[in-house]
């Protein structure tokens, strides 16, 4: 006989209040038929590829900045306010019930210069020996560091959004109060999210890691990252952003392989399992008198290599058209700004400059110490954009949504809520600047505070570089052609081949004769 029993588990009820739904920009923003082109000048930067060169007298003064092909270049483009744009007819929209915004439709990131591979390294690299093809069982000494160089992991990447890209790296964490950590103990590590700034180092094959805080020997990483950290974009976090402002779309290409295999020198912090047992599952003890009785280090590493650089695998110097972003923000540039975060170390040639210290005559013989060697790296960029003008209705639902998402948007549109009436009488002092009265309260600043004032970006002003004549620019012509706004198809003309007339012979019909 079958009987029904009620479930003994927990009963899950829906939330008492409905979950707020985030609107997509296409639900309340309407595109117009007005398109504009904007472009930059040739953007150049020159510096030392490994470290900033500082003044000997004043260490806070930087004489030559650090410019590496493995650095992030974060461009912050300032767009003109479309509600005050002179090229837009006032009758095109209702300023009392609508506001104008820019929508990104196309972008081309130009990279100048030839392809090249730039190496990095460390003059005192923690390399005990070659662990791939060893020629003997070596013993450690007090200092086994060597002068080692390598080529970094090959990376091409760009991220487009209206807010800075979010990066991640592993950093030193605060240990627990109990048990108290002892000197030499491995510190705990944690994943940290920060904005990617201009000049931050990308991963070169050693991981997204804070080398300055977690490698105290200062010899386990190349010079360009040993005193800083490497960041990697947190694509998981940015792709799950409910508003989708930091990541409209992105392009990424990575390539590397392990070229050499080394082993670290030093005392092993984590001992091998069962080190003092007579019998262990990890090795068989060596005979007496053998070098293998003293185990060597077991911290193995591989040096990265980006390998071949080819023009067939370039992400740059080609247009990208944005029809549908991966997030809820479909290319709307809130606050009239656009962030382009990129890194490209396929154009990574480092220039070696040699200068003779003293003048030489014709009988001079070469001596290496008579020449000073310098190292410089250059970066060359040029960008073009296609923007579409869009309208935002000033309805109650839209304004409430924007106020929750970013209140600065409504402030920039000069949409202020009516303040409540004063609750009572207020105090007003005479001679407020005298010492007899209390300190005057500071008047609120009229200038808008930049939310990214403490971050470093490469600012580019595009407020005077917009043009509605798209046909006068290379990217504009390609946009017009691919979008069908102009007739770019070729009509095939029908051709008739005229040949000499041919004579057609008709056979004469015979009359039928009737015999009587």
UniProtKB/Swiss-Prot annotation:
Compartment(s): Virion; Host nucleus
A GO cellular component entry from the record: T=7 icosahedral viral capsid
GO biological process: endocytosis involved in viral entry into host cell; virion attachment to host cell
Keywords on record: Capsid protein, Disulfide bond, Host nucleus, Host-virus interaction, Late protein, T=7 icosahedral capsid protein, Viral attachment to host cell, Viral penetration into host cytoplasm, Virion, Virus endocytosis by host, Virus entry into host cell
Domain of life: Viruses
Region Disordered: start-end pairs: 128-148, 496-516
Family from the record: Belongs to the papillomaviridae L1 protein family.
Known function: Forms an icosahedral capsid with a T=7 symmetry and a 50 nm diameter. The capsid is composed of 72 pentamers linked to each other by disulfide bonds and associated with L2 proteins. Binds to heparan sulfate proteoglycans on cell surface of basal layer keratinocytes to provide initial virion attachment. This binding mediates a conformational change in the virus capsid that facilitates efficient infection. The virion enters the host cell via endocytosis. During virus trafficking, L1 protein dissociates from the viral DNA and the genomic DNA is released to the host nucleus.
Subunit note: Self-assembles into homopentamers. The capsid has an icosahedral symmetry and consists of 72 capsomers, with each capsomer being a pentamer of L1. Interacts with the minor capsid protein L2; this interaction is necessary for viral genome encapsidation. Interacts with protein E2; this interaction enhances E2-dependent replication and transcription activation.
The protein's name: Major capsid protein L1
Native source species: Human papillomavirus 65
Lineage: Viruses, Monodnaviria, Shotokuvirae, Cossaviricota, Papovaviricetes
């Amino acid at each position: 006989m079958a009987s029904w029993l009620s479930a003994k588990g927990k009963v899950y009820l829906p939330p008492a209040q409905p979950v707020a739904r985030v609107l997509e920009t296409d639900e309340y923003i309407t595109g117009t038929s007005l398109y504009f082109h904007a472009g930059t000048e040739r953007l150049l930067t020159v510096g030392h590829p490994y470290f900033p060169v500082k003044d000997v007298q004043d260490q806070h003064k930087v004489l030559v900045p650090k410019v590496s092909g493995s650095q992030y270049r974060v461009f912050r483009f300032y767009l003109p306010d479309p509600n005050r744009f002179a090229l837009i007819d006032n009758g095109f929209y209702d300023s009392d019930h609508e506001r104008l915004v820019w929508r990104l439709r196309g972008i081309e990131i130009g990279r100048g210069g030839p392809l090249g591979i730039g190496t990095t390294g460390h003059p005192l690299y923690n390399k005990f020996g070659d662990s791939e093809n060893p020629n003997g069982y070596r013993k450690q000494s007090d200092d086994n560091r060597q002068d080692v160089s390598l080529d970094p992991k090959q990376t091409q990447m760009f991220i487009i959004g209206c807010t800075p890209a979010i990066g991640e790296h592993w950093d030193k964490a605060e240990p627990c109060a109990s048990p108290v950590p002892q000197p030499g103990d491995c510190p705990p590590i944690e994943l940290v999210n920060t904005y990617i700034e201009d000049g931050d180092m990308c991963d070169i094959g050693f991981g997204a890691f804070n080398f300055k805080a977690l490698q105290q020997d200062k010899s386990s990483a190349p010079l360009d990252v040993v005193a800083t950290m490497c960041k990697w974009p947190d694509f998981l976090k940015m792709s799950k952003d409910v508003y989708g402002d930091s990541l409209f779309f992105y392009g990424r290409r990575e390539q590397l392989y392990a070229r050499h295999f080394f082993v670290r020198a030093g005392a092993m912090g984590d001992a091998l399992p069962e080190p003092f047992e007579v019998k262990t599952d990890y090795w068989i003890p060596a005979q007496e008198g053998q070098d293998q009785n003293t185990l060597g280090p077991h911290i193995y590493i591989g040096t990265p290599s980006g390998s071949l650089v080819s023009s067939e695998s370039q992400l740059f110097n080609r247009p990208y058209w944005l029809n549908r972003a991966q997030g809820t923000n479909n290319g709307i540039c809130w606050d009239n700004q656009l962030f382009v975060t990129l890194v490209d170390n396929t154009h990574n040639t480092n220039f070696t400059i040699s200068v003779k210290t003293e003048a030489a005559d014709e009988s001079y013989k070469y001596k290496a110490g008579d020449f000073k060697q310098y190292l410089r790296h250059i970066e060359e960029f040029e960008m073009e954009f296609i923007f579409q003008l869009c309208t935002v209705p000033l309805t109650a639902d839209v304004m409430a949504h924007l106020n929750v998402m970013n209140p600065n948007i409504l402030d920039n549109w000069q949409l202020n809520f009516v303040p409540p009436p004063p609750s009572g009488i207020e105090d007003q002092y005479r001679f407020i600047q005298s010492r007899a009265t209390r300190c005057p309260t500071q008047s609120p600043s009229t200038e808008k505070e930049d939310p990214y004032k403490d971050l470093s970006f490469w600012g580019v002003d595009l407020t005077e570089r917009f043009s509605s004549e798209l046909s006068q620019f290379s990217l504009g012509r390609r946009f017009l052609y691919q979008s069908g706004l102009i007739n770019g198809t070729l009509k095939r003309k029908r051709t008739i081949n005229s040949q000499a007339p041919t004579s057609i012979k008709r056979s004469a019909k015979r009359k039928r004769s009737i015999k009587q």
